[in-house]
């Protein structure tokens, strides 16, 4: 690999507009398409500082800078359009988190890469609304936070309380939210307000290892640790009244609940198993990549198909997981307010995935094409009138749920036509890390983080207090910059801003 100085690297990066940058071919070897990334002035500085630091003599180890990872993805076989870096981008395994790429299904050389989905398959967010207001919740805020903490199993080794045996797990992996509906854990309309209606039909549990199933069985209906959370939130601003009203959000001060979780150890094992198989497939099929973390297989190879079927099962696991936590959240609220979830109007606004690969139809060079779209740390954001979004949102565009860092605001956005054309209907997913977990642990004290949250009037319940500094707001980019950048470039539109009043974490 040629090592260039920082100024030479910059000759390959060109500003297209105030908030968008082109990465030219040649920045990394064998690029089939260009790269693009979106950043405002503050986010841009973080991107270029990361690149500058990587150019220093003796800088080895760790992940490559985000711009390099975008360019390495642009060199993968079968990629179309551009390799896209969203404003929340940060270095990850293979693909950067916040990197999106689409591959032509009709090209026999096209690949699927587990690094383009991530280890937490279908890590995603679900948002529930209520008919409660901040004034209703404030007097019982601490009790409600405790009730949620008591109802939802949280933390690294947390075990689920939803009854589950091996046969149930097989069915849940195949059926996704249809299993949750049959078992009485969700309402029929919950499914309607869920990406893919909460079920990937391509799931095949027989392609999942026994080890993954063993890890997954006790974890269904658990929040986990890391950046996962359940938050009680207050509607602080409404930017698009019409779209918000379609979501059942009419007034400031309304209470919502956001659940952010994924496929736990199950998804991690599916990804780990696939990477081992794909390294063998790459040797056999003579596939070369710029980075060995970009292990991949031809989409139509046995390994590629096996991964997609197992990944779909992990996606279903995550939807069942969020559904189980929806059930527990409704129970906690009903118990606290001595009424029913129905009377509290606890409907699902939407549920989105942040880590997944899916076959979708997009326009490429003026013609519709079937593409395998990898979204890692990015969110599907389809525009109004798209056939794959619910009837309720046909006139507004798909809701996009963007979680902030702990104690900061979250946002609901909507998909746009421009996003469909520029980013294959994709936008940001969250704040995006600016400090690694190790640096966060070194630089921040968890007691200070907890004190800051209390000073903001936020109730906090956390299973592992010492993990809190990894998720402190100072470890992340400012989610407001991320969301505003997406809004300004037109790939999504701001709809609702939510402020946390209680945070439940692993």
UniProtKB/Swiss-Prot annotation:
It is an enzyme of class 6 (ligase). One of its GO terms (cellular component) is tRNA-splicing ligase complex. GMP binds at residues 227-231, 354-355, 403-406, 410, 429-432, 505. Its cofactor is Mn(2+). Mn(2+) 2 binds at residues 123, 260, 354. One of its GO terms (biological process) is tRNA splicing, via endonucleolytic cleavage and ligation. InterPro entries: RtcB, RtcB-like_sf, RtcB_euk. Disulfide bonds: none annotated. Its EC number is 6.5.1.8. Keywords: GTP-binding, Ligase, Manganese, Metal-binding, Nucleotide-binding, tRNA processing. The active site is at 429 (gmp-histidine intermediate). It catalyses: a 3'-end 3'-phospho-ribonucleotide-RNA + a 5'-end dephospho-ribonucleoside-RNA + GTP = a ribonucleotidyl-ribonucleotide-RNA + GMP + diphosphate; a 3'-end 2',3'-cyclophospho-ribonucleotide-RNA + a 5'-end dephospho-ribonucleoside-RNA + GTP + H2O = a ribonucleotidyl-ribonucleotide-RNA + GMP + diphosphate + H(+). The keyword Lyase does not apply. Pfam families: RtcB. It comes from the Eukaryota. Mn(2+) 1 binds at residues 120, 123, 228. The keyword Ribosomal protein does not apply. Ligation probably proceeds through 3 nucleotidyl transfer steps, with 2',3'-cyclic phosphate termini being hydrolyzed to 3'-P termini in a step that precedes 3'-P activation with GMP. In the first nucleotidyl transfer step, RTCB reacts with GTP to form a covalent RTCB-histidine-GMP intermediate with release of PPi; in the second step, the GMP moiety is transferred to the RNA 3'-P; in the third step, the 5'-OH from the opposite RNA strand attacks the activated 3'-P to form a 3',5'-phosphodiester bond and release GMP. Catalytic component of the tRNA-splicing ligase complex. Catalytic subunit of the tRNA-splicing ligase complex that acts by directly joining spliced tRNA halves to mature-sized tRNAs by incorporating the precursor-derived splice junction phosphate into the mature tRNA as a canonical 3',5'-phosphodiester. May act as an RNA ligase with broad substrate specificity, and may function toward other RNAs. Belongs to the RtcB family. PANTHER family: RNA-SPLICING LIGASE RTCB HOMOLOG (PTHR11118:SF1). This is RNA-splicing ligase RtcB homolog 1.
């Amino acid at each position: 690999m040629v090592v260039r100085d920082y100024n030479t690297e910059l000759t390959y990066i060109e500003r297209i507009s105030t908030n968008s940058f082109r990465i030219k071919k040649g920045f990394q070897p064998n690029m089939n398409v260009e790269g693009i990334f979106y950043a405002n002035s503050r986010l841009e500085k973080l991107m270029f500082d990361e690149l500058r630091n990587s150019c220093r003599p003796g800088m080895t180890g760790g992940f490559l800078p985000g711009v390099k990872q975008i360019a390495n993805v642009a060199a993968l076989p079968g990629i179309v359009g551009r390799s896209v870096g969203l404003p929340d981008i940060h270095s990850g395994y293979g693909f950067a988190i916040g990197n999106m790429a689409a591959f032509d299904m009709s090209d026999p050389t096209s690949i699927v890469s587990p690094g383009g989905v991530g280890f937490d398959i279908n890590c995603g967010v679900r948002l529930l609304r209520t008919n409660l207001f901040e004034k209703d919740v404030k007097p019982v805020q601490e009790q409600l936070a405790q009730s949620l903490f008591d109802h939802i199993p949280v933390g690294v080794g947390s075990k689920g309380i939803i009854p589950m045996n091996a046969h149930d797990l097989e069915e849940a992996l195949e059926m996704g939210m249809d299993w949750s509906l049959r078992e009485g854990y969700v309402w029929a309309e919950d499914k309607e307000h869920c990406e893919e209606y909460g079920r990937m039909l391509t799931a095949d549990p027989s392609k999942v290892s026994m080890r993954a199933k063993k890890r997954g069985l006790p974890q269904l209906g658990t929040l986990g640790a890391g950046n996962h959370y359940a938050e009680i939130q207050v509607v602080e601003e409404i930017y698009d009244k019409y779209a918000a009203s379609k979501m059942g959000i009419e007034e400031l001060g309304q209470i919502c609940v956001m659940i952010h979780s994924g496929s736990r150890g199950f998804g991690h094992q599916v990804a780990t198993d696939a990477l081992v198989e794909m390294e063998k497939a790459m040797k056999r099929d003579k596939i070369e990549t710029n980075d060995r973390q970009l292990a991949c297989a031809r989409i139509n190879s046995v390994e590629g198909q096996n991964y997609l079927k197992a990944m779909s099962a992990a996606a279903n696991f995550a939807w069942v997981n969020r559904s189980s936590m929806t059930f527990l959240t409704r129970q906690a609220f009903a118990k606290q307010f001595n009424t029913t979830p129905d009377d509290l109007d606890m409907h699902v606004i939407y549920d989105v995935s942040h880590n997944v690969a899916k076959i979708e139809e997009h326009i490429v060079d003026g013609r519709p094409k079937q593409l395998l779209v990898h979204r890692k740390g990015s969110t599907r954001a389809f525009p109004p009138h798209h056939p794959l979004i619910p009837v309720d949102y046909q006139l507004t565009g798909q809701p996009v749920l963007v979680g902030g860092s702990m104690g900061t605001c979250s946002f609901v956005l909507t998909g746009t036509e421009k996003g469909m054309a520029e980013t294959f209907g994709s936008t940001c997913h969250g704040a995006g890390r600016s400090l690694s977990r190790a640096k966060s642990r070194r630089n921040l004290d968890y007691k200070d983080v907890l004190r800051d949250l209390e000073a903001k009037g936020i109730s906090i319940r956390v299973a592992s207090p010492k993990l809190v500094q990894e998720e402190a707001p100072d470890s992340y980019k400012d989610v407001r910059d991320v969301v505003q950048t997406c809004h300004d470039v037109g790939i999504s539109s701001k709809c609702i801003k939510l402020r946390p009043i209680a945070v439940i974490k692993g």
